[in-house]
Regions:
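Short histidine-centered catalytic/ligand-binding loop motif
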Residues: 17-27, 71-73, 133-137
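Helical scaffold of the NTase/Pol beta-like nucleotidyltransferase catalytic core
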Residues: 1-52
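Short amphipathic alpha-helices in soluble, non-transmembrane regions
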Residues: 82-90
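Short glycine-aromatic motifs
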Residues: 46, 91-92
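Conserved catalytic core of two-metal-ion nucleotidyltransferases
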Residues: 92-125
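Catalytic cores of NTP-dependent nucleotidyl/adenyl transfer enzymes across multiple folds
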Residues: 124-166
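Active-site nucleotide-donor binding segment shared across nucleotidyl transfer reactions
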Residues: 39-78
C-alpha cells in the first residue's frame, strides 16, 4: 500500500520528487495559461488583483524544473482563508503558510509527479518580489545564463534535497 503524501517524511518526499531540470519547453506557457483560466473559473473576480507566471519556467532562455509557478495576488482586505479554501476545494494542496503568504502545489501524487505540476504562491497585493526577479532575468540574458549555470551545477549534487538545492 502506498503511503499518503502527508504521512511521508521529508526524505521520502525528496526521493519521490527529485530535482529534475529540462531545457525550456514552450508548452509551459500553455500550461500556465490553461491553469490561469481554470483559476479564474472558480475564484471570485473581485478577489484577484493579478495572476502571474513566475519562476524559471517563465524565463524562456533557461533550463528549469518542469513545475509551473503561479503567483496569485489578492486585495489586502480579502480574507486569505477564503481563497485558501477555494484552492483546496479545487485540487490544490496547502504546503506552507506564514505571515500573509501561502504556498500550494498541484500535481504531486503518491506515485510521483503528475504530467503537469504547479506551485501556486498566494500573496497579498504588492508582495511580489518574484516578479522583479523574473523580469530581471528576462531583461538581462547574461544574468539568466549565470543563474542557469548555477542551477545546473547544483542539480545532481542536491537531486534529493530540495532545501539544499534552493
Amino acid at each position: 500500500m502506498t503511503k499518503a503524501l502527508e504521512d511521508m517524511t521529508l526524505e521520502e518526499l525528496w526521493q519521490l520528487f527529485p530535482i529534475f531540470l529540462r531545457e525550456h519547453q514552450d508548452e509551459w506557457k500553455d500550461w500556465y495559461e490553461e491553469e490561469r483560466l481554470r483559476l479564474l473559473s472558480f475564484l471570485p473576480e473581485h478577489q484577484i488583483v493579478r495572476l502571474s507566471h513566475i519562476g524559471s519556467t517563465s524565463v524562456e532562455t533557461i533550463w528549469a524544473k518542469p513545475i509551473v509557478d503561479i503567483m496569485l495576488e489578492i486585495p489586502k482586505e480579502t480574507d486569505m482563508a477564503v481563497t485558501r479554501d477555494l484552492l483546496l476545494q479545487n485540487g490544490y494542496l496547502l504546503m506552507s503558510e506564514s505571515q500573509g503568504r501561502m504556498s500550494f502545489n498541484k500535481g504531486y501524487t503518491p506515485s510521483g509527479f503528475a504530467k503537469r505540476v504547479f506551485h501556486l504562491h498566494l500573496r497579498y497585493e504588492g508582495d511580489h518580489d518574484e516578479l522583479y526577479f523574473r523580469d530581471y532575468l528576462q531583461e538581462h540574458p547574461a544574468v539568466a545564463e549565470d543563474y542557469e549555470k548555477l542551477k545546473l551545477s547544483l542539480w545532481k549534487q542536491y537531486e534529493h534535497n530540495r532545501d539544499a538545492y534552493t
